[in-house]
Design a protein with these regions (language model features):
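Non-transmembrane, aqueous-exposed alpha-helical and coiled segments at domain scale
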Residues: 1-429
Length: 429
């Protein structure tokens, strides 16, 4: 993806998350100088298999850390500092060099224990399917102009005032939500946590937008890494069954602190089929026995929660929509090998809604939940793909499947993944 005219590349999920962005970022990061996360928080789970039996799950630290790239957590991320350092220490213990490789935006908002208490209490009532990591409540504080940011820790007296006020308000809300006294937040525990973490967090704090801008000015390659997927975007996803941030490419410039004209290319990551976690519509969801087969073959369990993912067939309506709202310039198709044993593979090419054929995504979740998918069935290849390293290595039926996804999606396929390891990748020239 990187070249004379593609210095800054965004990687986004083009379905409901869990598309394999971690692997694709890991592959691209080999040629990147800087990798930046631009939204989400500890609810993300990017799995990277580096080979030789080594696999890493990254929640807040950009996947580029495994390739030795300098990594930045942008202002659009809501940062759980306790989990950040647990993740950092785990990487160091496994031999990954992290010293002077990680920076954090001083404008990033902090996810604190009271956010998690609120998240879990609300989930008991609303059943949206959150991870319980406090992401939504942190973004609420951010947009309500009452959050605590990394840079606030430079003035601990001011930070203490902010935290005490927020804990008091959180406990009032928890009481309204029916939480007992044992489920209330403790302000003094919050303050002790921040006082313990501040000396370690503040040396990482930078003006992330300036770091990225200066890297681009030096001619360096910059990779902007998204979390979740386009259909979970708070504006463009299957609302209200969405996350609380802008997961689409438009969120990258805002979540990093650069202008949109600095972005040269946007790569959308899609599975060769479709999955989602939790509640909400999934038009091409397979019947239970087939979904279970895909789930077992693809290891479709959440990297953050362990929850089984709902599984279905490739949905071209979803991907075309993602191409449009992200301005995708290319696609990376992952987990093609999961379909190795299927004799026939249905592909969703359109929807019927109230007897009419439609080829675009309805805005309201009730209508999306009522659509009937229109399928075309293509032949499977029934051969293992794990050793393929060029398109020419794929069986004709597998190559035809990739070509069909490209035609239906409306963007060129740039990468095809045929296994979990970083070397099991086909780059399409």
């Amino acid at each position: 993806m990187f070249g004379p005219k593609t210095q800054c590349v965004v990687v986004v999920g083009a379905q409901w998350g869990d598309e394999g962005k971690g692997k694709i970022v890991d592959v691209l990061a080999e040629r990147a100088d800087l990798v930046v996360r631009y939204q989400g928080g500890a609810n993300a789970g990017h799995t990277v298999d580096t080979g030789e039996g080594k696999s890493f799950v990254l929640h807040q630290i950009p996947s580029g850390i495994l390739q030795g790239a300098v990594c930045v957590v942008g202002n659009g991320v809501v940062l759980d500092p306790e989990q950040l350092f647990a993740e950092l220490d785990a990487l160091t213990a496994r031999g990954v060099r992290t010293e002077q490789k990680l920076h954090v935006s001083d404008r990033a908002h902090l996810t604190l224990p009271y956010h998690k208490l609120l998240d879990r209490a609300r989930e008991q009532q609303e059943k949206i399917g959150t991870t319980g990591r406090g992401i939504g409540p942190t973004y609420e504080d951010k947009y309500g102009r009452r959050g605590v940011r990394v840079g606030d820790l430079r003035n601990l007296a001011r930070a203490r005032e902010l935290v005490r006020a927020r804990v008091t308000a959180a406990n009032q809300m928890l009481t309204l939500l029916g939480a007992g006294s044992a489920e209330q937040a403790n302000a003094e525990e919050h303050l002790r946590l921040l006082e313990r973490l501040a000396p370690r967090l503040l040396p990482l704090a930078v003006d992330a937008g300036r770091v990225v801008w200066e890297a681009l000015a030096r001619g360096e390659s910059v990779l902007l890494e998204g979390a979740q997927g386009a259909l979970l975007d708070v504006d463009h996803g299957t609302y209200p069954y969405v996350t609380s941030s802008n997961t689409t490419a438009g969120g990258a410039a805002v979540g990093v602190g650069i202008g949109p004209t600095a972005i040269d290319a946007v790569l959308g990551v899609v599975k060769a089929y479709t999955t989602r976690v939790g509640n909400g519509p999934l038009p091409t969801e397979a019947e239970p026995s087939v979904a279970q087969r895909i789930r077992e073959l693809g290891g479709e369990f959440g990297a953050t929660t362990g929850r089984p993912r709902r599984c279905g067939w490739f949905d071209a309506v979803v991907v075309r929509y993602a191409v449009r709202v992200n301005g995708l310039t290319g696609l990376a198709v992952t987990k093609l090998d999961v379909l190795d044993t299927f004799a026939e593979i249905p592909v969703g090419v359109g929807y019927r809604l109230d007897g009419e054929t439609i080829d675009s995504m309805p805005a309201d979740v009730e209508s999306i939940g009522r659509v009937e998918p229109i399928y075309e069935t293509v032949p499977g290849w029934q051969k293992p793909l794990s050793e393929a390293r060029r398109l020419a290595d794929l069986p004709p039926a597998a190559r035809a499947y990739v070509d069909r996804l490209q035609d239906l999606g409306g963007a060129p396929v740039r990468y095809v993944s045929v296994g979990t390891r970083r070397d099991q990748i086909i780059e399409v020239n």
